[in-house]
Amino acid sequence: MSPQYSGTSSQALPPGYCFNEYQIEEVIGEGGFGIVYRAYDRELDRQVAIKEYIPASMVSRADDMRLVLRSERFTRIFQAGLISFIQEAKTLARFSHPGLVHVLRFWQANDTAYMVMQLYSGETLKNLYSRQPEVVTETWIRKMLPPLFSALKTLHDQGYLHRDIAPDNLQIQANGEPVLLDFGSACKEIGHLTDKTEIMLKPGYAP
């Protein structure tokens, strides 16, 4: 994950909040189903990214930092998304490929779950194209595709499909190398359960 973010979140953990060796520094990304933080690993003296499962429309943050359901009717959907989030962390942690986001560990706390990932430089393809559309030429894309195909082959060889290959889920590092970010499994699982799959699966990017 990368440090490109300019917004704020009232639901986010505060700077300085700690999980064992990890200390939250700031929010660097946010979507409808998760918040990504830049954090400092005090044991290994490095920065990492931590993603928190937090479907904002279903939960609120209590004073003790736990997530609280806004309504009991969200229980089944929230738990299904949580299970998918944890399974995705386990799956991604199996791979060590420069084109796939590197998950270092995960855990459950605050009635939700977290995954620790490598912190990547650069920005998403979506942001890059919005900021410098002239950079994303056919020649540039052709150069970017081989390492992306290699990452996909690694997944396919192990029987996995990445169904969220979209510009906002593809990190372009400072050296130009692409990194496929998370599968968005929790988002998809919740989409299935709420009959909004056509929205959650990003038409044009997911089968």
Residue ranges: model-predicted function:
Residues 106:
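Activation-segment/catalytic-loop signature of the eukaryotic protein kinase fold
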Residues 110-124:
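Conserved short submotifs of the Hanks-type protein kinase catalytic core
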